Amino acid sequence: MFIWEVVKMSKSVYRADFPLLDLSDVIYMDSAATSQRPQAVIDAIDEFYKRHNANPLRGVYKLSVEATQDYENARTKVAKFINASGSEEIIFTRNATESLNLVAYSYGLNNIKAGDEIAVSILEHHSNLLPWQMVARATGAKLVFLDCEEDGEITKAEIDSKINGKTKIVACTQISNVLGIPTPIEYIIEKAHSVGAVAVVDGAQSIPHKKIDVKALDADFFAFSGHKLCGPMGIGVLYGKKELLDAMPPFLSGGEMIEYVSRDTATYAELPHKFEAGTVNAEGVVGLAAAIDYVEGIGYD
C-alpha cells in the first residue's frame, strides 16, 4: 500500500465510525491482526449489558429469555451472512483457532487412521497447522504440504500432485495472513472432494474482505474470528455441514451441552449446542451480529 493511499484512507468518511481513529491521529495498519471496532458494535454490547444481561439458555425469566433471543438471533444472522443451510450449522467458539481445533479433535481424531494423509498448505497460520500436526502424531497419519512458488502461488499442478486417494483431510487458508494473497481455494476444495477428502477452510483473513457463500464454496468446514470483522475479541465461528457435525462427538463437556445426565452416563444436546459447553460469550455474539450489520451496511465494494 502506498503512503498516499493511506492518507486517502485516513480521510475516509468511515473513519468517524471508529472512536479510536476518530478521536486521534492514528493511522491503523494492523487490521490483519485485529480490526478496530465501530461505534455500532460498542453500542450493541453496551445495550446488551444495560438491558438484557443474563445467562442465555439457562432460565425462563424475562432477562434470560431476552438474552437467549439475542444469542440465537445472532446465530441466524451469521448463518444468513455466509449462506449456511441453517443456524444449526453455526457453532460459536472463542476464535478461529478454537474452531479449527474443534474440527481437528472432534472430526480428525475420530476419522483419521495410520497411513492416511492430511494435506495443508505451506501458507498456513499456526492455528491451521499445529492441530493437524497433533492429529498426525496421534493417529500415525502423514502430514503433506502444498508448497508455493516464489510469488506465493499454489499451482494446480502442485495440488494435483499432493492430493490423492490417501488424502482424508485438506486444510487450507483462503487468504494468507502473511502474504495477503488468495489461494485457489475453490480448486483445492474440488480436488479434495474428488478423492473423498473433507475440506477445512481457514477464513479468518478472507471474510473481512470478500462475501463468503459456504454453499457455493462447498467447504465442509469454514472457520473465522469476529475480531477481524470489526467485531469484539473472544468470539469465533465454526461453520460445518450438518451431516458432519451430527456425526461428531462434543469437543468440550459441561453445562448446557447435555440433554440428560446421570451418575454414569449422559446424552448430548442437539446441534449446535452440543459443541457450546459452559457459559457462552453472549456479549461477544451480540457484538458480532452488530459487526455483520455494519459490514453489510457499507458493503464489500
Task: Describe the residue ranges of each PLM region.
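Pyridoxal 5′-phosphate
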Residues: 2-301
